């Protein structure tokens, strides 16, 4: 589907796999939401959980996703026959856009989004468009004694993607 809004972060085409469509531009997750609020949010999935009801007829899927301003929880409760389409499209590392309503989950004891529609999206990559590239003098990687989570190969690949001609690691 073609999304009905322009975004600096989200590409304009999306793949709808649950519901009828997305008609609103997404809000930032950092805004305050309450029970009953109807929202459209986007984010990158970083964790998922799944369960099947005791009778085997209902699939319960929980996804945790973030737009880098905050994080929210998405809970999909659907017939078991829909489980594969949900599991294959909502995975850690994938980005989604969701329209739904905030509801209090009495089982998890927190607010989560019950979706009407969910679509897979692609995010626009950050670019360094400067003619003269900047110099980063200090980085920590997993090779550092200091705490770091970025592998050196990821930093080298990002520098290459931004058009840097050289990189030095000491």
Description of each model-found segment:
Residues 1-170:
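Phosphodiester-processing cores and adjacent nucleic acid-binding clamps
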């Amino acid at each position: 589907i073609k999304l009905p809004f322009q975004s600096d972060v989200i590409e304009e085409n999306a793949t709808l796999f649950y519901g009828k469509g997305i008609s609103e531009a997404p809000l930032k997750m950092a805004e305050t939401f309450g029970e009953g609020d109807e929202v459209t949010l986007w984010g990158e999935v970083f964790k998922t959980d799944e369960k099947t009801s005791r009778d085997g007829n209902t699939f319960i899927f929980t996804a945790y996703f973030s737009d880098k301003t905050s994080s929210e929880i998405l809970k999909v409760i659907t017939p078991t026959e829909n489980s594969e389409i949900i599991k294959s499209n909502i995975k850690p590392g994938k980005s989604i856009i969701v329209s739904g309503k905030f509801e209090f989950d009495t089982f998890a004891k927190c607010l989560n989004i019950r979706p009407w529609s969910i679509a897979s999206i692609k995010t626009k990559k950050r670019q360094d468009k400067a003619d003269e590239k900047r110099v980063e003098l200090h980085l920590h990687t997993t090779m550092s004694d200091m705490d770091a989570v970025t592998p050196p190969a990821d930093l080298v690949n990002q520098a290459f993607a931004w058009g840097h001609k050289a990189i030095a690691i000491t």
